[in-house]
Amino acid sequence: MKYQQLENLESGWKWKYLVKKHREGELITCYIEASAAKEAVDLLLTLENEPVHVNSWIEKHINPALLNRMKQTIRARRKRHFNAEHQHTRKKSIDLEFMVWQRLAGLAQRRGKTLSETVVQLIEDAEHKEKYANQMSTLKNDLQAMLGKKE
């Protein structure tokens, strides 16, 4: 396991995830009978500040179809949580117009790189081009100055 699991923190995430899914109308319990499902959900709603009990609620009452999706969501959230601790792993987002994204994605695919690697490569290419243009301009000015002095 790459990222440390923090039981209390993750139990809070699980509680929020389950409550959100319930409010969106998804069945979060394994019960078909409405009264049993409502009873289990009511119990869950009382467990917001009791992380140990949230995990036991999950073991007893969760809808099996929801369990894997919840695990994936928590795993992704754990990764984002730990990556956010360090500047170099913290993710940022930018808004692109669809056509720009499409061209960038195509270029990245042709180069066999990620979108981030492609953006870095394009920036480096532009910086090298700018540096080369400045060197040529300086060289041209130096040559003109040398030729102008000899006459």
UniProtKB/Swiss-Prot annotation:
Pfam name, any one: MatP
InterPro entries xref list: Arc_rbn_hlx_hlx, MatP, MatP_C, MatP_N, MatP_N_sf
Keywords attached to this entry: Cell cycle, Cell division, Cytoplasm, DNA-binding
Domain of life: Bacteria
Subcellular location as annotated: Cytoplasm
GO molecular function per UniProt: sequence-specific DNA binding
Keyword Cell cycle in annotation: yes
Database matches in Gene3D superfamilies: MatP, N-terminal domain (1.20.1270.380), Met repressor-like (1.10.1220.10)
Gene Ontology CC, one term: cytoplasm
Primary location recorded for the protein, binned into one broad class: cytoplasm
GO biological-process terms attached to the record: cell division; regulation of DNA-templated transcription
Family the entry assigns: Belongs to the MatP family.
Record function comment: Required for spatial organization of the terminus region of the chromosome (Ter macrodomain) during the cell cycle. Prevents early segregation of duplicated Ter macrodomains during cell division. Binds specifically to matS, which is a 13 bp signature motif repeated within the Ter macrodomain.
Subunit structure and binding partners: Homodimer.
Protein name: Macrodomain Ter protein
Lineage of the species this protein comes from: Bacteria, Pseudomonadati, Pseudomonadota, Gammaproteobacteria, Enterobacterales
